[in-house]
């Protein structure tokens, strides 16, 4: 084995010289330089600095403007809540531990950080699935006369929380476990060991199948069908400039959604799966740290993609920030007026909200 396994930890370094210590008790500067830990701390501070205001603003603007309190926006708010879970439950803890060079908060702190980070990430992921399914049902109309109402939104919210808890809770109760990973200053699911009594193998397979592959397939199926529907509507009305504009806007949105999803989760999932299938092989501490920390950026670009691309929300946000006046109101109004009125696909049913 090219690492050192101990009670509730796995350090990716063989303890041939006797320098490896528990990441709960001692700084891990023998893995990488102190400057690397300082850089991680600064990175987490930047994510907090960006992630908290934009997600809090999302909640505040929606509460302040009654016209934003629509069923679909409940799911978007759920996405912001998930990101705030990650910011407060995960990012602040990771910044603090990075500044110390080890997981100074101990085993309990590791469980809490791993739980909140996983919960927030999973709520966000399944919220995107619900959004994708809603867009597919409304735009492609596999069920005639379907309207996404408040009851559907509540069921969608409940679904995201149930699925998130079904992934984040088991490691707390003995099906797998949370341990420090990478540079040992953040915690995640144990992909590294076959710890007796924790059934890590079955949980990791369950997690990848039910909480990565399935949601990814659903998202790309739904938005693939959405794109086809928009193209069909545009082809049926070749001379409609507004329909062509709708096609372009939706195409851009779909491409951004797909790329963001892959960029956020595929590196982390791929590295985690590699480590799981090559347990005992040699890999450095940075190997898992980089994709794990990069995946955390979803708390920043999730609201940018799924909320700030909403023209109505952007108008309300500017109004809130400018004390009740929108200096770009004329431009926003012209943009809103240009929304497509195509019978098959309207921009109100194609836009993110």
From Swiss-Prot:
| GO CC annotations on file | membrane; photoreceptor disc membrane; plasma membrane
State the name under which the record lists this protein: Rhodopsin
Explain the post-translational modification.
Answer: Phosphorylated on some or all of the serine and threonine residues present in the C-terminal region. Contains one covalently linked retinal chromophore.
A GO BP term here is:
visual perception
Which InterPro entries does the entry link to? Answer: GPCR_opsins, GPCR_Rhodpsn, GPCR_Rhodpsn_7TM, Opsin, Retinal_BS, Rhodopsin, Rhodopsin_N
Residue ranges, Extracellular side: 1-36, 97-110, 174-202, 275-286
CDD domains tied to this protein: 7tmA_MWS_opsin
**What's the domain of life for this entry?**
Eukaryota
Give me the Cytoplasmic side stretches, as residue ranges: 62-73, 134-152, 225-252, 309-353
Question: Lipid moiety-binding region for S-palmitoyl cysteine?
Answer: 322-323
Q: Which cysteines are joined by disulfide bonds?
A: 110-187
Sites marked Plays an important role in the conformation switch to the active conformation:
113
Which lineage ranks, top first, belong to the organism behind this chain?
Answer: Eukaryota, Metazoa, Chordata, Craniata, Vertebrata
Family matches, as PANTHER family: OPSIN
Naturally occurring in which organism (per UniProt): Dicentrarchus labrax (European seabass)
